[in-house]
Amino acid sequence: MDDNKRKSLDAALKSLDKTFGKGTILRLGDKEVEKIDSIPTGSVGLDLALGIGGVPKGRIIEIYGPESSGKTTLTLHIIAECQKKGGVCAFIDAEHALDVKYAKNLGVDTENLYISQPDFGEQALEIVETIARSGAIDLIVVDSVAALTPKAEIEGDMGDQHVGLQARLMSQALRKLTGIVHKMNTTVIFINQIRMKIGMMGYGTPETTTGGNALKFYSSVRLDVRKTATLKQNDEPIGNRVKVKVAKNKVAPPFKQAEFDVMFGEGVSREGELIDYGVKLDIIDKSGAWFSYKASKLGQGRENAKAFLKENPAIADEITQAIQNSIGIDSMILGAKEDDEGEE
């Protein structure tokens, strides 16, 4: 670059720094690329699929899927993991349906969880913006986008047409939120529902999410959560097998998948994942229906092996460490211990 151009650029940069603050614009080579911090999800498989050990901090996340697929359960696990690392969390319960007892069973510190049950969509998103701007909240969960009903629709008569009102509300809110959450390093998770496209013909999926296209665009990570099977013991349902696909990922390669057990009343089964990954990595031996680790017989059948690991946390921790070492990601949190390192 010649001297005249350099002087003009320097003058422009100084003017921008003076007007908008130092660091408004930087040359990429002058600044070390910052490491993306993450919040573990409570599932080792999903942490691996996300590529950075969890959901990224300072970003907008969308978790969507059919009803009763495990979306809220997954977000409650993320809240619990964030709290374990000293984070402050807020839950915007637009559906007015949070089960506090269930959240506590999943490890959420409900005594220190901030909760709001807004009356309409504008109020909910205003609350999200205000607490995000404070810089004191590490994680905000909005449950759900479908329940963010615009005030005009609530105050209107039944049958009134409000075409595109919610989509415009979401678009306006996300334009403001994106910069705020990045600057304050706050993660915002929107839970969303699936709807069928009206008049869908030909190619492509007939499914879509509520609230327009803005959330798809502004989200750094989108997780598609689906129930694949019902887990039974003695013909009694005890949980669901859940598959999560990383439909969009701006911080690591997308389209990876993870499967895990979600047990009724307990949430994501850590023991089930230890068995699955232990067998896959040849840490746990599987002979017929029997599972064993070193000299220890874990049990006959997957459910019995899970029960053994639950009753013997020392062996579960040892298998956890072996999986961690085999994967080679030291920062990965498998749920065995709290990570007390370097959190601001």
Curated annotation (Swiss-Prot):
Tell me the keywords, alphabetical order: ATP-binding, Cytoplasm, DNA damage, DNA recombination, DNA repair, DNA-binding, Nucleotide-binding, SOS response
Plastid as a keyword?
no
Which cellular component appears as one GO term in the record? cytosol
Primary place of residence? cytoplasm
Q: Sorted alphabetically, which SUPFAM superfamilies does this protein's record hold?
A: P-loop containing nucleoside triphosphate hydrolases, RecA protein, C-terminal domain
What are its GO biological-process terms? DNA recombination; DNA repair; SOS response
**Subcellular location per the Swiss-Prot or TrEMBL entry:** Cytoplasm
Keyword Transport set for record:
no
**Which parts of the sequence bind ATP?**
65-72
List the Gene Ontology MF annotations in alphabetical order: ATP binding; ATP hydrolysis activity; ATP-dependent DNA damage sensor activity; damaged DNA binding; single-stranded DNA binding
Its function, per the record, reads: Can catalyze the hydrolysis of ATP in the presence of single-stranded DNA, the ATP-dependent uptake of single-stranded DNA by duplex DNA, and the ATP-dependent hybridization of homologous single-stranded DNAs. It interacts with LexA causing its activation and leading to its autocatalytic cleavage.
Q: Which family does it belong to?
A: Belongs to the RecA family.
Check the record and name the PANTHER family matching this protein. Answer: MITOCHONDRIAL DNA REPAIR PROTEIN RECA HOMOLOG-RELATED, RECA
Protein's name in the database: Protein RecA
